[in-house]
């Protein structure tokens, strides 16, 4: 999990301009990290590129926190 979490954290820090210490599994992209809907779409696209996978729109809607993203990615690698 650490490797996936580290990679997700780097993407979130780069995309949202937040501090690395703010990017914890329980952090909500919108409420805690200040992402808007477009930011979330762009994050999902960047995660797809980074992990060479496709995340369906239906699944993307369920990814609300950093932990959700890590869990989803780990279960689909």
Curated annotation (Swiss-Prot):
Major localization listed first in the record, in broad terms: cytoplasm
PROSITE patterns: CARRIER, PHOSPHOPANTETHEINE
One GO CC annotation: cytosol
Top-level taxon of origin: Bacteria
Post-translational modifications: 4'-phosphopantetheine is transferred from CoA to a specific serine of apo-ACP by AcpS. This modification is essential for activity because fatty acids are bound in thioester linkage to the sulfhydryl of the prosthetic group.
Biological process (GO), any one: lipid A biosynthetic process
Cellular compartments annotated: Cytoplasm
Signal peptide: none
Family stated for the protein in its record: Belongs to the acyl carrier protein (ACP) family.
Protein name in UniProt: Acyl carrier protein
Organism: Bacillus mycoides (strain KBAB4) (Bacillus weihenstephanensis)
